[in-house]
Amino acid sequence: MTSPAAFPGGACFAFTIMDDTDNATVENVQPIYRLLESLGMRTTKTVWPVRCEEGSEMFGAGETLDDPGYRDFVVDLGRRGFEIAFHGATMESSHRERTMRGLNRFTEMFGPPRVHANHSFNRENLYWGVDRIDDPILRAAYRAALGHPDDFYQGHVPGSAFWWGDLCAGQIKYVRNLTFDEINLRRVNPSMPYSDDRRPYVPWWFSASDAENVDAFVELISVGNQSRLEAEGGVCIVATHLGKGFCVNGAVRDDVRELLVRLAERRGWFVPVGPMLDELRVRRTDRALPPGEWRRMQWRWARDLMLRRLATLRRARKRKGAQNQRRVGSQM
């Protein structure tokens, strides 16, 4: 377990953001980072160190460290106290050689990465797909939902073309796994960060609060949730994509700005993921995750994932209905 003592500086809760770099460009994320800096918040930004030579249908709009303007922007973020983290070598699956090239590029610019998050369906993802979890019922359900063979993700499989588990174990300290629709992660994973002997190539795992895009982020950090996070002395690491709608026409969306300003006025500890997990780790009395906690986490993650998928379908139907109404109206 992790001690619930107050945080450094007398803060009574901890909050940060882990920004997955999908779709990120200088244009669509710079304003939100300037806002975070002005509020005294320092967060974590993941990057892709090298370009994707084969192109990417889903993520091709995102920039990498091979883009000079983006590279300069990210280097400047690091100088300003933001943490730069690894999101794989690039936006599509990478064999070991490209992953090594990406890690070397990252290390040359920022030093070895301390924090990593798997990306989408990249085959070099570590302990991904059904290997994220152990519960046999949930593994069977997730297998059916994904439609991937069990050995699709091979970053942790020695001898695979996608193998890089040894590199992770030697360089990276923290890797993200399960995410939840919960602002206070102490409610679902009080033993974070934790080690898992069944997944030995990751030194420490951590959980996150899920906010896929700007609308989910606004819902997650509502004023009511902020008040609860503060009252409970909670920990929040938001897994999100700051390139997905946070900035419009060069400005941070009004509701995002208002909520972040209100959050910054509270007695929070606003540091990047790595330093936050370092502080939580030294409070651990052991490295392991209690079996009961892990069992509850898996089922809560599965429930939250299903509810998010249903909510996405409802929003899509609502948008389609609105489009149909406009189409009918224009024909009258």
Residue ranges and their predicted role:
Residues 210:
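C-terminal active-site rim and adjoining tail of enzyme catalytic domains
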Residues 1-202, 216-238, 246-332:
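Catalytic alpha-helical scaffold of carbohydrate-active enzymes acting on polysaccharides/glycoconjugates
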Residues 243:
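Short, glycine-/Ser/Thr-/acidic-enriched flexible segments
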